Every structure is written in C-alpha cells, then in structure tokens.
C-alpha cells in the first residue's frame, strides 16, 4: 500500500507490543521496500514518494507522506542500520521540493485560492510528514535549525484563524522559515481525515514530548476533541478517526468521550452504509484449498 495507511507503523508498534519474530520480518520487509523502492532517490522528485500505484511510480501525486522518515525510524533505532539512516537523511530538506511541486495543484489550484507564499501545503499529511523529517534530523545530529523549523510551524498554525480547522486545505508555506499562513476568508473551515491517519498523529504526539509549545498543544487537543463533530458538520464525512477522540478523552479525563471513541470503533455513523464485515469461506474448485 506504499505506506498510504501507515502500515509500517502499525506493524512496528505491533512488534514492540508482542515481540513476535514473524511481525518483525514483515515490518522489516515493508520498511526496506517502502523506503528504498517506493521513494525517488535521484532526479526531480528525489525526496518524495509515489502512492496509489498499480505499478511503481505511476501516480502523479509525488508526496512526502510516502517518503517520510517516520516510516524508517523504528528499524533504524532498533538496528542502527546505516543504509536506513541514509534514507532518513535524504528527506531532511524534502520540503524544498514544494517550490516546484505543489501537492494541491489539482485539487485546490492557486487560481481559485489566493496565496502569495512561495509554496503551499496541507497541515497534514504534508507538514506533519516534513516535521517528522526535521524531528529525526534534529535528534540524530543535534542540528537545532530543524527543531526551530518545527517550532515556527507549530506557532504559526496556533495563530491561524481556526487553527487546525483553518481552510482551505492548501495553506501558504515558506520552506526557508517553516512558517504557515493563509490569505483566504478567515471564516473558512475544513477538516481532513488524511491529516492523522498517515503517521501524522503519532509523529505529532512524539514531537510534543520533545518540544513544549503550549499554544500548539492546545490547538492539537482542540482538534482532537472536536474533529468528529466538525467533520460531519462541514462535509458529512464518515471518517471519524476514533484515535483523535480517544486522545482527547485521555488528556481531558473525559469518561463520556472515551466511551464514545470506543463505541465508534464498532458501530457505523448515522446515514452511512454498514461496513461489510462478513466472513466467507471459498471452496474448491474456485480455489486449490478452502480459503
């Protein structure tokens, strides 16, 4: 799946919980494949990855969420594999590709969404992927320039008109400073389920343990607590992203919210089709043996 739904992460977290060697082997294979094969290492797209492909590199969306260092951190820190370390170094300045390649050029063209910033991105999955790259470079080398870039982003997001709900999805960004801006209607709001299902949630939570920016923490907690309701209000989104509400419930010590998050894992949202969770046995001659 080219890391599209954070499969590397859930494999590694599963290994850390269980210690199972079969999970280790799968996580290792995924890490090596997605880090070495699904990412461009030379050429105009170097530092980015390609997703949604039937064949490799077929998708026009060359994005940081595929190449981000977050996928490789587990394997590197558990093995000190230097090749893996090189792959993380490769992407430390991948945000500079935004000068030439706008991830929202088709979905939200500049002609329709005013922006005089030198580049554009989404808070997630784009900025969170870049921030994970910077966090990794900072912790591996001690280069505080990358830490400062994260801080600039956190502080600028915290003062946006609607913080993490600020619309449109494509916001102004300056790769030289790390500052995020908007020039659109300050009343415009948006939600994006992709923000926190592609490694962004885990990276943000780890960053907040390393960098204490109260206004960012407040913005992140507010987004987690209100995401489900806001997503339904704005677009009738069926993606509830239950871990956001669970996170908010824990930090707010809100039992009712915790119960709702747990319930959401097993029930469907009103007005949406029920998930087709059915177990079907397929028998020969359709398959060689029962499946």
Locate the predicted segments by residue.
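Catalytic cores of extracellular degradative/oxidative enzymes
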Residues: 1-279, 284-285
């Amino acid at each position: 799946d080219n890391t599209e739904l954070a499969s590397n992460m859930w494999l590694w977290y599963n290994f850390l919980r269980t210690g199972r060697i079969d999970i280790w082997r799968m996580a290792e294979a995924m890490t090596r494949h997605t880090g070495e094969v699904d990412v461009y290492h030379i050429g105009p797209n170097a530092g980015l990855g390609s997703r949604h492909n039937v064949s490799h590199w077929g998708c026009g969306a060359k994005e940081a969420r595929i190449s981000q260092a977050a996928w490789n951190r587990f394997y590197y820190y558990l093995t000190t594999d230097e090749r893996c370390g090189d792959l993380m170094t490769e992407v430390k300045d991948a945000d500079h590709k935004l000068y030439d390649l706008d991830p929202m050029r088709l979905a939200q063209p500049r002609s329709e969404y005013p922006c005089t910033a030198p580049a554009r991105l989404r808070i997630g999955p784009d900025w969170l992927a870049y921030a994970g790259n910077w966090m990794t470079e900072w912790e591996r080398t001690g280069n505080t320039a990358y830490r400062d870039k994260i801080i600039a982003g956190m502080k600028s997001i915290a003062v946006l008109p609607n913080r993490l709900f600020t619309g449109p999805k494509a916001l102004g960004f300056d790769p030289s400073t790390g500052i995020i801006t908007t020039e659109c209607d300050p009343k415009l709001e948006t939600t994006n389920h992709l923000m926190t299902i592609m490694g962004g949630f885990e990276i943000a939570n780890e960053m907040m343990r390393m960098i204490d920016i109260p206004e960012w923490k407040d913005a992140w907690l507010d987004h987690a607590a209100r995401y489900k309701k806001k997503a339904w209000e704005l677009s009738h989104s069926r993606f509830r992203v239950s871990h956001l509400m669970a996170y908010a419930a824990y930090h707010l010590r809100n039992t009712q919210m915790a119960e709702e998050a747990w319930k959401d894992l097993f029930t469907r949202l009103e007005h949406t089709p029920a998930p087709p969770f059915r177990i079907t046995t397929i028998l020969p001659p359709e398959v060689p043996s029962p499946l």
